[in-house]
Amino acid sequence: QHSRFELTGSFFNPGPYSGFLVAILPIALHYTLTGHRIARILSGVVLVLLLLVLPATLSRGAWLAAITGCGIVLSNYFHLHNRLKALFQKHKLTVFITTICIFFLVTGTLIGIYRLKKESADGRWLIWKVSSTLVTSHPITGVGFGHFAGAYGEAQAAYFAAAERSAGEELVADAPETAFNEFGQITTETGIIGLLLFLTIIIGAFKAARHSNSKAATGMVGSLAAFLVFACFSYPFNVLPLLVLFTLLLAQCTPMQPGSRWLSGIFYTFLFLPVYFLATGQQEREQAYKRWKSEQIYFNMQIFERTVDNYKKLYPLLKDQPAFLFEYGQCLSRTGQPETSNLILEEASQLSADPMIRNIMGKNYQTMKQYTQAESAFLKASRMVPNRLYPLYLLAQMYNESGQIDKAITTARLLLEKVPKVPSSATEEMKRDMQKLIKDIQ
């Protein structure tokens, strides 16, 4: 269980946990309505448990997904489309008034859901807004698979540098690893081409399920629809169990078609080859992860002279991990290798939106007396996540060290005016240091 959350299941976070629950809910409802006696009883028990647990996760996206998935199952079971069509033909005025009432009810419900965790919703809206600028600048092929976070950090820095933004936007800004919308992330990373391929797979699965004779087809369609609605507000493709569940739902929606054996053999051979090549390299990579975790003990103890050499050996296997690159860059910085450190940290910045990467790069430039580059790094870190005080703190100190007194005072005053997102003893200490800096200079 996560220390910040009371209900996480085995997912360490209520978000993915609620996604797992909501993907099962429509299937449980379907079998409760259509299953045989034992299946109906077991499915009913599961359904009740899911309905009890799901509200406690406080996942608004999961609630909307549950309504969508269960709505599909209920609509099919009670033939609501035909009934509503007949009702509309007989009582047009009544249906019209009822529709208006339902519209206002849904609108009020959505507003209530938004206000439930307003700051979280505003933060996701900012992520989607900034992500849209990446889609605009890289519409066809995207920024590259796995490069969302790094590209997002650059885009958010450009967004806050371009114009004066509201205090509310500055307060909710953060350094996300995902877009909190899988459709948006797919488009950002792989462009319109990737999105169209993904939509083709989804539409194909729905069409196949529609023409399927399977009794479970409706439940699977409801679950897949619920999963996709949840994917509009979260990051299920970044959680392996949910990615496996999504694959299984796609497979269940697409029944096997009879075909020639040799074609099937060729298909499975090509399917197996990438799995084989990936699996053969995993053992060495797993050992590298274990060595990294053991070396982190010395890293946290700040024994950098020992750690830096071992990190260098692990670099070829873990150079796609931004957390490892950040630690390796710090080790190089703390062992008197600022130039090499910045090369490693530049790689990390391509994979992560964390402004601390730019802060360390700025300190490295400052060590090398390259004050212009240091200023650029600190300013970018400040614009990436404007509610953080540390980049401005480092920038003011750098200005003071380099003799840029006016800029030092201006930056120190700017920091004192800032309201930190999470006040702490560290932020209070930084403000005291800035007050002292201004007093000493003047």
Predicted regions and their residues:
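Hydrophobic alpha-helical transmembrane segments in integral membrane proteins
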Residues: 109-123, 268-302
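Structural marker of alpha-solenoid helical repeat scaffolds
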Residues: 317, 350-351, 384, 418
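TPR alpha-solenoid repeat register
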Residues: 324, 357-358, 391, 425
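Alpha-helical transmembrane segments of multi-pass inner-membrane proteins
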Residues: 1-5, 9-93, 97-114, 188, ...
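Interfacial juxtamembrane loops and adjacent helix segments
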Residues: 1-11, 145-188
